[in-house]
UniProtKB/Swiss-Prot annotation:
Belongs to the SNF7 family. Residues 229-240 have a biased composition (Basic and acidic residues). The modification Phosphothreonine is found at residue 72. The gene is SNF7. Core component of the ESCRT-III complex (endosomal sorting required for transport complex III). ESCRT-III appears to be sequentially assembled as a flat lattice on the endosome membrane and forms a transient 450 kDa complex that contains DID4, oligomerized SNF7, VPS20 and VPS24. SNF7 polymerizes into spirals at the surface of lipid bilayers. SNF7 polymerization is nucleated by association of SNF7 with VPS20; the process is terminated through association of VPS24, possibly by capping the SNF7 filament. Interacts with VTA1; the interaction requires DID2. Interacts with BRO1. This is Vacuolar-sorting protein SNF7. Acts a component of the ESCRT-III complex required for the sorting and concentration of proteins resulting in the entry of these proteins into the invaginating vesicles of the multivesicular body (MVB). The sequential action of ESCRT-0, -I, and -II together with the ordered assembly of ESCRT-III links membrane invagination to cargo sorting. Membrane scission in the neck of the growing vesicle releases mature, cargo-laden ILVs into the lumen. The modification Phosphoserine is found at residues 119, 193. It comes from Saccharomyces cerevisiae (strain ATCC 204508 / S288c). The lineage of its organism: Eukaryota, Fungi, Dikarya, Ascomycota, Saccharomycotina. Residues 195-212 have a biased composition (Polar residues).
Length: 240
């Protein structure tokens, strides 16, 4: 009530906005100074170029005046750069302080939320709830064991020794069948191996003729190669 009458609420709102406004204004002014800095550097370069031109023309008076302007602009540039450095430091400090403030506010809100959550809890209630959960878990395990228990009784159980004997008999039968297959295959293959197949002889005259034709072809190719070489040498001598 009293705070609203004396305007404390509005002042608190203004205090919250003041850091942000200060940061914005500082950044704007730093940008303005940065533009001024670039302009002054351009003027310094121009004055130096004018001094060089006047010297080449032999006009030392005008060259000296250009250098004086350059010195004046350099002094102004130094002041602008110093102001920029101070404002950048101030901006960094305000941003850091504002970040700390916002962090503190967030942590306070988190603490309030945790307090609200824990207001309806105490250690006794937690222990009681955990005991109930453990009981239900144990009950669930017992139910799972009961459901997964086999329904076969002792009267329906199979003799393991009897199963082993039957398995050995099946293995012996398989071995006998494989042996009989091997014997039958050997018996059927024996007559075929005894028969000899005679093949006709191959004439050798055609082979000799083909060899001679190949040699003749190679000799003709060698002669053609020599002719081509001679022709190329003649063309080279004639400059063709």
């Amino acid at each position: 009530m009293w705070s609203s009458l004396f305007g404390w609420t509005s002042s608190n709102a203004k205090n919250k906005e003041s850091p942000t406004k200060a940061i914005v204004r500082l950044r704007e002014h730093i940008n303005l100074l940065s533009k001024k800095q670039s302009h002054l550097r351009t003027q310094i370069t121009n004055q130096e170029n004018e001094a060089r031109i006047f010297l080449t023309k032999g006009n030392k008076v005008m060259a000296k005046n250009a250098l004086k302007k350059k010195k004046t602009i350099e002094q102004l540039l130094s002041k602008v750069e110093g102001t920029m450095e101070s404002m950048e430091q101030q901006l960094f400090s305000i941003e850091s302080a504002n970040l700390n403030l916002e962090t503190m506010r967030a942590m306070q809100e988190g603490a309030k939320a945790m307090k609200t959550i824990h207001s309806g809890l105490d250690i006794d209630k937690v222990d009681e709830t955990m005991d109930e959960i453990r009981e239900q878990v144990e009950l669930g395990d017992e139910i799972s064991d009961a459901i997964s228990r086999p329904l076969i009784t002792g009267a329906n159980e199979v003799d393991e020794d009897e199963l082993d004997e039957e398995l050995d008999m099946l293995a012996q039968e398989n071995a006998n069948q494989e042996t009989s297959k091997i014997v039958n295959n050997n018996v059927n293959a024996a007559p075929i191996s005894e028969n000899k197949v005679s093949l006709p002889s191959v004439p050798s005259n055609k082979i000799k003729q083909s060899e001679n034709s190949v040699k003749d072809g190679e000799e003709e190719e060698d002669e053609e190669d020599e002719d081509e070489k001679a022709l190329r040498e003649l063309q080279a001598e004639m400059g063709l």
